[in-house]
Each structure stands twice: as structure tokens, then as C-alpha cells.
Design a protein with these regions (language model features):
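Feature captures the FAD/FMN-dependent oxidoreductase FAD-binding
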Residues: 75-160
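Glycine-rich active-site loop/strand segments that organize a redox cofactor
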Residues: 38-91
Length: 209
């Protein structure tokens, strides 16, 4: 009797959600491949390293990920402490990505540019739901292709902020003033202090003159 082929799961993003998905996939006998566009796991979280989270450690540690970490000799943080983004990276994301079996399943500097079903296009739909996925991504060496049985998008929204206008549209004049608008959470007390000192906050946006 032939052995069933191991299913491959492509996971976009190596943040806490993507790594948790990979940990659960491994526990279920699946083969996860994590594609992270940044140079290291937790790339987006590192951009808000200065922000303290609104929930303590006990609610931010995935159980499957925790099992992998404990098997690698990890010391869990105090459950009632509220971590910053930097804490989350240093005490959870980095050890999970570098010290557990997940390290062999993560591709960094891998920017996904397109996903489709193998053998299908916009005018062919019958049987589409059973066809494997084809993922195109870029890395430092050029374009690459990956086949997977399923895709999990855990890329998040940090690098894809909403526009300032209503109805999901770019506001009039927004594109022209893009260099003056901060769409995320700048570190106004640290890294970005010089840029924003003495500037004005308007309509929830930090704007430079």
C-alpha cells in the first residue's frame, strides 16, 4: 500500500499568527512553508516594537507554538506581564523561528506577488476548488514558484494601511501629501522624536509641515 503524500501548506507571513499556523500544521502531519517578505521573522512587529500590547502574555502565546518552544528549552515569560512589540519578538517570535523545528520551514525575503490555481484561469472554473495552488514570489535571487495544497494568508495589515479617505478611497490630495502622513504608529518618544517634535496632530493623523 502506498503512503499518502504529505500535504503542503503555504503560509504568507512569519509573524505570530503565521508561525502559529505552521506549528499547528506540523502537529497535524502537514508540511508548512512560511513565506516572509521581510529579512527576518516578525518583520512587521519590529516596526511597532515600542508599543505595549493590550493583553498579557498568557493570551499571546499559541499552544502549539508553546509546545515547540518548551521542547527546545524555552523559558516562558510571566503570564500576567503586558509585553511590548520588542518583547514579543525577543521572547517569542525569534526563539520560535530560530530555535524550534520551524526554522527549516521559513523562507525570508520571499515576497508573494501572485497566487492562482494550477491549470485554471478566469474563464475556467469547473473543479477549481480541488486544484493545488501555485504561488509566485520574489527573493534575493529572482522569481520563484511554489506549489501548495492550501494557502493561509497571515500577512496582516501593517504594510497595507487603509487610506485616509472615507469608503476605503484615497482622500483628495492624500497622494500628494503622502510623505507627510504617518499611517502607522510612529515612535514619537524615541526613534521618530526628531521628526515629530513640535508638529500637529489632525484627524487622527500625524502630519509634518
Amino acid at each position: 500500500m502506498s503512503t499518502p503524500e504529505t500535504k503542503t501548506i503555504a503560509i504568507i507571513g512569519a509573524g505570530p499568527v503565521g508561525l502559529a499556523a505552521a506549528a499547528h500544521a506540523l502537529e497535524r502531519g502537514l508540511k508548512p512553508i512560511v513565506l516572509e517578505s521581510g529579512p527576518e521573522a516578525g518583520h512587521a512587529v519590529r516596526q511597532w516594537a515600542h508599543v505595549r500590547m493590550f493583553s498579557p502574555w498568557e493570551y499571546n502565546i499559541d499552544k502549539a507554538s508553546e509546545r515547540l518552544l518548551l521542547a527546545a528549552g524555552w523559558n516562558s515569560p510571566e503570564p500576567n506581564v503586558y509585553p511590548t512589540g520588542a518583547d514579543l519578538v525577543a521572547n517569542y517570535i525569534e526563539p520560535l523561528a530560530a530555535r524550534t523545528v520551524l526554522k527549516d520551514h521559513i523562507k525570508t525575503k520571499a515576497e508573494v506577488i501572485a497566487i492562482s490555481r494550477v491549470g485554471f484561469d478566469k474563464v475556467k472554473t469547473k473543479g477549481r476548488e480541488t486544484a493545488p495552488f501555485e504561488i509566485h514570489y520574489r527573493n534575493g535571487k529572482g522569481p520563484e514558484t511554489l506549489r501548495a495544497d492550501a494557502v493561509i494568508d497571515s500577512s496582516g495589515t501593517w504594510l497595507a494601511s487603509n487610506p485616509a479617505g472615507s469608503n476605503g478611497l484615497v482622500a483628495i490630495g492624500e497622494a500628494e501629501q503622502a510623505s507627510r502622513i504617518a499611517y502607522a504608529m510612529p515612535d514619537v518618544l524615541g526613534r521618530d522624536r526628531a521628526r515629530y517634535a513640535g508638529e500637529t496632530v489632525a484627524d487622527g493623523l500625524l502630519v509634518r509641515r
